[in-house]
């Protein structure tokens, strides 16, 4: 219901970037304006990843496995995301809430404490014992992204990096999740365990070549 990076000022502050987003706004408005004879809550998932995921974040893991991923400079980008196991935990907590505090509330589903794209990538690299991830200046990645745009236009092939994908990687935000924390409590999966479970599934499916090893979670 809001474009990537836009932080809403309220539950009804919408900024949909496309027709798909507009359709979700319409769905929320229908729920809010209805006279439902039951309790209801609205959940807004962020970027969900984990076993059985497809395309974008699966490619993220595969690029690190093949040592083709590069950090974007030294800046840390906060990308609200959620491991699917944590997402299910949050939904069930909201769904089975008996306190009434969740009634007519809106919840963002994002892991906490948050992790940057850089930390996420380094956790994947360590779990796979892959080669150390290199850091590239932004101008180099801009050139690669532009080349990807040309390849996509001419060859109808979707390369790993395009200008729009690079922009998306640099866009994040701190979504309001205090009410999510309040009702869901501690999440069951830390990033280290979540990455291992995801990589283990990918290894069994032959999506990656490095056999994952679980690393000890940070305190």
Where on the chain are the PLM-derived regions?
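Substrate-positioning beta->alpha
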Residues: 26-27, 53-59, 73-96, 104-108
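C-terminal beta-strand-loop-alpha-helix "lid" module of Rossmann-like NAD(P)-dependent dehydrogenases
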Residues: 59-65
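Active-site loop of classical SDR/Rossmann-like NAD(P)-dependent oxidoreductases
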Residues: 117, 160-178
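Glycine-rich Rossmann NAD(P)(H)-binding loop
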Residues: 50, 72-77, 105-114, 125-127, ...
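Mid/C-terminal beta-alpha module of Rossmann-like enzyme folds, strongest
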Residues: 97-160, 189-192, 196-219
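Residue-level signal for the nucleotide or nucleotide-sugar donor/cofactor binding architecture
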Residues: 18, 79-85, 115, 175, ...
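Conserved catalytic core of Hanks-type protein kinase domains
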Residues: 34, 63, 94, 143
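Catalytic helix-loop patch of NAD(P)-dependent Rossmann-fold dehydrogenases
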Residues: 2-49, 53, 65, 69-73
